[in-house]
């Protein structure tokens, strides 16, 4: 009888744990989902997201806290890249659980810093105040196994139709690679524009991939090239040059 009770208890715990994990995952947005909406105050005024940004690519960055070393370097890097993001038609939104007044003080301070011996930059993108944690919980930015009051380093790339196209999560001790985020953004834009795929370690301007057929064609078909810009390494591996 005792053994049966132990077995039932272990079974109940396993089922409860699996249910809890599924419930947590189910509560977070996934790739292809509509970006959760929110209204909040920011350093540039009130934001109604994503309505204010529909029709544009946008990236939401969550960070643990203002006036912290890693977060400060990340925002200074983004400040240096503002012109590039504008060129790509991308709107940036920064979010944490800090107060709006703290955001404002932090921005003012960072705008005086000569980061990497460069002139100080003016930070034009909004920093959203999420003191009540509502937005953070909607997006899965607050993950209990890391911290219950601060966001992880989240990145959400959202397309002009307000669909989530890519997500990244970094631990609090590791700064984000802005070049990789930029690469992913341009890869998504390239894939959408040309109906192509991007290979491993692809860089903007590099050769892209075409969708492969499900079954190998005969050798005569394999030898055919529809364009001088198209080349094949195998029936399932077809590349195309976008830029000569």
How should these model regions be labeled?
Residues 1-4:
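Positively charged n-region of N-terminal signal peptides that target proteins for export
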């Amino acid at each position: 009888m005792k053994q049966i009770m132990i077995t039932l208890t272990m079974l109940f715990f396993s089922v409860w744990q699996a249910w809890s994990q599924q419930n947590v995952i189910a509560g977070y947005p996934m790739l292809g989902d509509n970006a959760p909406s929110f209204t909040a105050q920011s350093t540039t005024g009130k934001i109604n997201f994503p309505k204010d940004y529909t029709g544009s690519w946008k990236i939401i960055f969550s960070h643990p806290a203002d006036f912290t070393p890693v977060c400060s370097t990340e925002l200074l890097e983004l400040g240096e890249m503002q012109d590039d993001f504008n060129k790509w038609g991308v709107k940036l939104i920064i979010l944490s659980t800090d107060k709006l007044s703290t955001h404002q003080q932090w921005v003012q301070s960072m705008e005086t810093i000569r980061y990497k011996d460069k002139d100080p930059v003016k930070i034009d993108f909004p920093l959203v105040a999420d003191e009540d944690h509502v937005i953070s919980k909607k997006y899965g930015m607050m993950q209990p196994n890391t911290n219950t009051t601060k966001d992880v380093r989240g990145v959400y790339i959202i397309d002009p139709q307000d669909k989530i196209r890519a997500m990244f999560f970094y631990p609090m001790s590791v700064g984000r690679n802005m070049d990789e985020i930029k690469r992913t953004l341009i890869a998504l834009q390239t894939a959408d524009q040309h109906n192509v795929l991007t290979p491993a370690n692809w860089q903007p301007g590099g050769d892209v991939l075409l969708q492969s057929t499900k079954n190998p064609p005969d050798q005569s078909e394999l030898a055919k090239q529809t364009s001088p810009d198209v080349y094949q390494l195998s029936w399932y591996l077809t590349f195309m040059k976008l830029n000569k």
